[in-house]
Amino acid sequence: MEAALLVCQYTIQSLIHLTGEDPGFFNVEIPEFPFYPTCNVCTADVNVTINFDVGGKKHQLDLDFGQLTPHTKAVYQPRGAFGGSENATNLFLLELLGAGELALTMRSKKLPINVTTGEEQQVSLESVDVYFQDVFGTMWCHHAEMQNPVYLIPETVPYIKWDNCNSTNITAVVRAQGLDVTLPLSLPTSAQDSNFSVKTEMLGNEIDIECIMEDGEISQVLPGDNKFNITCSGYESHVPSGGILTSTSPVATPIPGTGYAYSLRLTPRPVSRFLGNNSILYVFYSGNGPKASGGDYCIQSNIVFSDEIPASQDMPTNTTDITYVGDNATYSVPMVTSEDANSPNVTVTAFWAWPNNTETDFKCKWTLTSGTPSGCENISGAFASNRTFDITVSGLGTAPKTLIITRTATNATTTTHKVIFSKAPESTTTSPTLNTTGFADPNTTTGLPSSTHVPTNLTAPASTGPTVSTADVTSPTPAGTTSGASPVTPSPSPWDNGTESKAPDMTSSTSPVTTPTPNATSPTPAVTTPTPNATSPTPAVTTPTPNATSPTLGKTSPTSAVTTPTPNATSPTLGKTSPTSAVTTPTPNATSPTLGKTSPTSAVTTPTPNATGPTVGETSPQANATNHTLGGTSPTPVVTSQPKNATSAVTTGQHNITSSSTSSMSLRPSSNPETLSPSTSDNSTSHMPLLTSAHPTGGENITQVTPASISTHHVSTSSPAPRPGTTSQASGPGNSSTSTKPGEVNVTKGTPPQNATSPQAPSGQKTAVPTVTSTGGKANSTTGGKHTTGHGARTSTEPTTDYGGDSTTPRPRYNATTYLPPSTSSKLRPRWTFTSPPVTTAQATVPVPPTSQPRFSNLSMLVLQWASLAVLTLLLLLVMADCAFRRNLSTSHTYTTPPYDDAETYV
């Protein structure tokens, strides 16, 4: 492995910690890979090496994922596997999660390599190396080491399901490994009289993902939103999973016969695509209070996986406008945060935006020891004595041109600069004004920080004076967060349009030299002061006038017309964008009537809180700086502006709740489902405020409390002892019946929950498959010679001889220290017991399709039968006539000589 890493110019290392039960796959998130902004042809070649240990012998599996095209495809399967088994390519997936992050997923119950007999139980995963070669030929590497060896135990997983779970017509959608679903449910008591606990299980295609509430339960449900964290089995994503329980009934108005209505939103992750679109989400919840007896309930929802491209993979970008005179212009690139005067490994690249030829447009690459790159036209560069890098461009012509510059230091920390060069008109006497700083604080990390997995974005401080802004000038504060700081939540900016804007001349007719104001130009310039980096023989600059209207531009200030998204905007359907061009601004409480429509001519769609993340064809929300604002535009002045902040720092409609930790909780809202499988309903009609996160789908920031330490042991989850006064010994899914974990409840079996199309589920409902359960369950199982039935039973088509054992035997887990023997524990978990009141779901009864009628009447069928008989009779007559004719011919013929076959006997 060490020899292989020598080819890497930049290497990131991480330690992977797998805990809990084995869900049938393992997932490794790999952040901080560079995807260059403003470039639709910037691809990357990716190869992965997986290092195994087989009984003390090293084994290497090489996977070729080919070329990644982040603008057109998000999920990749290996094109080839070298050193692996015959079906190894079917056991791996590589997925783009947005913000430069990849996720490698591998099945854990099937061996991807060939081993000899007796070695099946000795295969452990040691490390993963990812090789990422960008369009400039730079090799970026990520080495992920397993904190403890992960043993792969090959086994067949039986088909598992849960009986008597109320079905819903709501579909749970998975985007970029994050599931998002909002379900209606009912509890017997009002909010302040209830507690609440929830567990989920996702089953399909030999994958079994379980998620439980971290704190066990919500001890008291409050009016409004009740937020909580959940933990899922297997790999723990750096973006936490969570949920929100919201009371939707008035305090004193229960639903007759069912109780009080609530809305439950769940966002577990990671959810592997290996589940498939036929998988099912089971939600088991419990809630009760001192005034009423509670119970355990179960509802289920179908799962579909979206092929939608996640939010931009592009690196965050600082934007700078430069207006120059003459033939040349220069921009100075400062050092990155991790760089010092002795850093040996520094790389600078440059390319013109929107190239169309990968063979010729990516030749401008410099290092500390390299000379002038071959094939780099109209661009030259050199390191100065203070380690800044000066780039000089020439021969640009009169039209503005955009140059993308990146600078990377030793530990792969990268800053990206978007510089727009505009040539001043020949008639003016304005001296060249260059902004060569690009940053307000050189010690601030910009681009891709090495100390955090959360993607960096650019922020602008709130102004304390009059609001005077343009679409292309924001705070000079650069993007990024320092090591250990709280991650910044990216939010699409109304100004990010992705188009290049021109900087017209704004010279006053009464002054030889005019420096434009940020937002408007006075018709008669008065006495003014000079701007930085600009020389003027006459001190004449118009003072900023908020909301003033320019007589030349004829457009109002952005501060007078910008409409920001409101938090109460409700979108019952996802992905609606305006069919018109320019800018679409969401109005308060706007409702989008159409599912999945996108406009091919829309320049920018300002997302509502219920539909976040750009659709296919949209430009990056991180790095697309333009001169367009909502409600009117003000073109960029001729002089240099400060570096543009690509992301607005003020996002209306978001709610931030923090506690004692800096890690943010991602509850991903729904996004545009253009490529979703058809479903009967959409689940984006929740009335709760939507959430933002560092990932593309957004969501409200909820800072979770980070535990002091993570246990490396694999302790089986189990259900608690029953409450006093209860008699049922059934336990929850995947749990034994001996635990006393707080928040988990068991109650007496009673009335089953309400089905989707019937008032009440019948007792002992059976599944369509032969059912055999472990002793913990009671659905169609034989225990001690007694046949019993019950609700919530989990059933399987596999015999108990293969997966027998009692319910207290732990399931297979990631083993950190010893080899795992072949599993004999039951894969059929105890059922989930139900009691009243029944669950009601907001679903319509599926209508029974009408019985199809015959296409022909009896008379028509009779005519067809007689016609067929006539045809057959005619054919028979023709055959008989032909035979008679041939018989007549044969009888009239006489031989004059013997037959030829006996000719030798006649001489």
From Swiss-Prot:
UniProt function note: Initiates virion attachment to host B-lymphocyte cell, leading to virus entry. Acts by binding to host CR2 at the surface of B-lymphocytes, facilitating the binding of viral glycoprotein gp42 to HLA class II molecules. Attachment triggers virion-host membrane fusion and invasion of the host cell.
Residue stretches of biased makeup (Polar residues): 442-500, 617-658, 672-687, 700-741, 748-781, 794-827
Outcome (variant: residue 215 to A): 30% loss of interaction with host CR2
Keyword terms, alphabetized: Glycoprotein, Host membrane, Host-virus interaction, Late protein, Membrane, Transmembrane, Transmembrane helix, Virion
One Gene Ontology biological process: symbiont entry into host cell
Organism: Epstein-Barr virus (strain B95-8) (HHV-4)
Posttranslational mods: Extensively glycosylated.
UniProt-reported outcome of changing residue 210 to A: 60% loss of interaction with host CR2
Cellular compartments per GO CC: host cell membrane; membrane; virion membrane
Uses in industry and biotechnology: Primary surface antigen capable of inducing and reacting with virus-neutralizing antibodies. Almost all EBV candidate vaccines are based on gp350 proteins.
Start-end of Low complexity biased regions: 428-437, 507-612, 659-671, 782-792
Chief location category: virion
Topology, Intravirion side: 882-907
Quaternary structure note: Interacts with host CR2.
Name of the molecule in the record: Envelope glycoprotein GP350
InterPro entries for the chain: GP350_C_dom_herpes, GP350_C_dom_herpes_sf, GP350_N_A_dom_herpes, GP350_N_A_dom_herpes_sf, GP350_N_B_dom_herpes
Record's keyword annotation contains Iron-sulfur: no
Family classification: Belongs to the Epstein-Barr GP350 family.
